[in-house]
Amino acid sequence: KVVRSQIADSPIATITGLSGSLLWTGNQGEIVFDMHVGRELTGGTIEGLAPCSWFELQFKDGSKVTISGTSMLTFADIGQKKLRLKQGAFTADVVPQPVGKPMIIQTPSTVIEVVGTRFEVEALQAFTTVNVREGNVRLKHLVDGNAVDIPANYRVIAEAGGDLSPMLLPAAENYWKSQLDVQAGGFGKWLPATKKRPA
């Protein structure tokens, strides 16, 4: 017979990348500042303590999640991955999840269900932004219970009283041109191009 506390103490993920000031608090209250790539973690809470902090975690099934900046993420996997992004920036590349057991990500204002996709989340107290790169994500607004499916290449900004309609993600710029006619050692301010002058 497997006892639930034994499951909770088993490693569920491995650190695959990190930088900056970070703090991990394990399920049993263990606090660790000295983390390294390759360390296996049970569930717990990871905190990015500085704007330059980032942390990447890979679950046993190959799904990867990353937090960056001043962020706080609690994670567990007892047959289903459940994460709580209290604040900050979060990206995920999720392999297909078992039927009926999507990855659940809760922010202060939303619940996001993921069955397998690549997406980003920014969670603040007042709103949550979800950008979907591949696959689909289901977002439920906690304030009013409204839900929306977000397809690939779309985003939703969920805020109190706001519209949950998906918006097309802006296309990435692949080409630009600049003209820097400044003497060596000179400084200037970038200005966008107008009809009368180049950028």
Where are the language model's segments positioned?
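Short acidic/polar, Gly/Pro-enriched loop/turn segments located at secondary-structure boundaries
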Residues: 1-129, 134-199
